[in-house]
Amino acid sequence: MLSEPVELYYISDDRLVATTQSIVSPATISQVLAALIAGPPTGNNGLGLRSALPTVLNAEIDISKGVAQINTTAEFLTELSPIDQRLAIAQLVLTFTRRPGVGQVIFTVDDQNVAVPRGRGDLAKPGSTVSFDDYSSLIVALAG
């Protein structure tokens, strides 16, 4: 069984850290999402890391023309503090824009466009895309 390295982003002191995990190849978007939701790696690579994502995340992800549309339920945004909301969005955007064929992400809640916080704290307008660069200011370092 072949596996491939996948970059997943987790939180350390309100900053994001890239970790690499092996996922069965070819890694699908749903496999990447499941790995991200499962939480940081065990052992030294995951030491001090956490996830802002809920352990149960109802999300559908469709990729078209380089844009990943992540459609979730209202609970995804309402159950998180404002800081964790920004970090959870950053985890998703940074992780998925590292995948081949994805350059931007757009968020919807119950199929309606929503504003999401960017890394600097400002809001991306409903229906506008966000990218890796919108959250790169939150990245602290590369972990193994």
What is the meaning of each model-derived region?
Residues 1-144:
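Bimodal "functional hotspot" detector
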